[in-house]
């Protein structure tokens, strides 16, 4: 029997294989090692989804479903998939599909044991055009069920916190009612947001929807959103005679989320609950449940209702979401739950990293336009001028983006950005220099010049009777000739590259020493025309 870790790993590889075969499927992005109670980010899998060319720079909408295990989270997400695929194909009112069609998508099944472990996202990111004409990327996220027999409170809190921190809509999946312990668990899971808010002066999370399953009191509050909101107002209402602890729980929820809603769903029917052979066919689901599904899913995913993920007032792109995942997972990989400040620190770090990555792209793309790829050789002076221009453009872009942590915190990332730009510039200079025909023949020219000079010196010293010196010059001529032939073989065959590099370095050193004895004007001409090296960075002088 597979261990939980092995099962999750197999699921992750299976999703990866599905993507390679062109078939969408769930992708494991946060792996739970239950025996060690630790978490691991599957960065490569997450990047393969979020960094696809057509969506990487789109603002992202993340819809997550979280809650206790075996309460039908994946079941609901699969109906969301049906709706999104229906919209992708043009949209029609009967998006629920054929009554005989089994429900597929995120893995789910009946029974008492949990099916999902860690955090999964759907491999296909849906692009949706909002009524205003803006395109957004929609990501569906499934989470491990809370409070199973193998999960600690820390495990549950970590998964819920991660999904809430990275989603724009968190659906809190509950059974039958909103109990007081449900609210207390929610308070525990979102405590980081409440404390971080004291410093950033705004609500850290966006939309929370209580999704009440198997609602049994439609005679008090009708199914759907309207009845749900009336029920929620009553359950979260703060009264003077309530105990302070109960008041704090309710105030905390309102202080953490910008918007809180509730939807009441009826029971899907006995066939769904009791049959071991139920495979999600609509014909086996109660009509009341299907009717409410047709109200719930469009309410969450209708283009006019979609809410982009925001952090610190700035919208997050798919590429930025990857950075936030990487930053957040670090603070949960220790032994203890992080101090609430850690979330603020990690958020600020990811925020600055995303801004730096965007600024770096601006510099790189502009430099590629003038000297990248098949572009012709560019004068080093012009290259440096463009470098300084685009560097300033990138820095201005970085400074303009709203970032958490303050100026002092962001300054470190600005310095790192400048270092990365400097490295890019050096690489562009090398690439540009390789296009200079004089630079290509620098080493053989130096060797040939040395051979000719030593040959003349050998003849002259032999003529005046200095035979020993003449023989020494002849030996040096032979060595240089061997070096020239060796260099030619290395360039032709591609072998012994280290030796070829040593010969190039030696030739460059000789040329540099020779150039140092020539006047400034001659020196500049030699370096620009023969060596093809960029002038020294004016800022470093």
Swiss-Prot record:
Mg(2+) binds at residue 142. The modification N6-acetyllysine is found at residue 391. Residues 343-434 are annotated as: 3HB (three-helix bundle) domain. It is found in: Endoplasmic reticulum membrane. Its main location: endoplasmic reticulum. It is a multi-pass membrane protein. One of its GO terms (biological process) is endoplasmic reticulum membrane fusion. Keywords: Acetylation, Endoplasmic reticulum, GTP-binding, Hydrolase, Magnesium, Membrane, Metal-binding, Nucleotide-binding, Transmembrane, Transmembrane helix. Residues 1-25 are annotated as: N-terminal hypervariable region (HVR). The chain crosses the membrane at residues 446-466, 468-488. Expressed in cardiomyocytes (at protein level). Disulfide bonds: none annotated. Residues 57-305 form the GB1/RHD3-type G domain. GO terms for cellular component: endoplasmic reticulum tubular network membrane. CDD domains: GBP. Residues 1-22 are annotated as: Disordered. The GB1/RHD3-type G domain mediates GTP-binding and hydrolysis as well as homodimerization. The two three-helix bundle (3HB) regions in the homodimer are loosely associated initially, but they tighten upon GTP hydrolysis, facilitating the fusion of membranes. Belongs to the TRAFAC class dynamin-like GTPase superfamily. GB1/RHD3 GTPase family. GB1 subfamily. PANTHER family: GUANYLATE BINDING PROTEIN. Atlastin-3 (ATL3) is a membrane-anchored GTPase that mediates the GTP-dependent fusion of endoplasmic reticulum (ER) membranes, maintaining the continuous ER network. It facilitates the formation of three-way junctions where ER tubules intersect. Two atlastin-3 on neighboring ER tubules bind GTP and form loose homodimers through the GB1/RHD3-type G domains and 3HB regions. Upon GTP hydrolysis, the 3HB regions tighten, pulling the membranes together to drive their fusion. After fusion, the homodimer disassembles upon release of inorganic phosphate (Pi). Monomeric and homodimeric. The homodimer, transiently formed by two molecules on opposing membranes, is the active form mediating ER membrane fusion. Interacts with ZFYVE27; both proteins are involved in endoplasmic reticulum tubular network organization. Interacts with REEP5; both proteins are involved in endoplasmic reticulum tubular network organization. This is Atlastin-3. It comes from Mus musculus. The gene is Atl3.
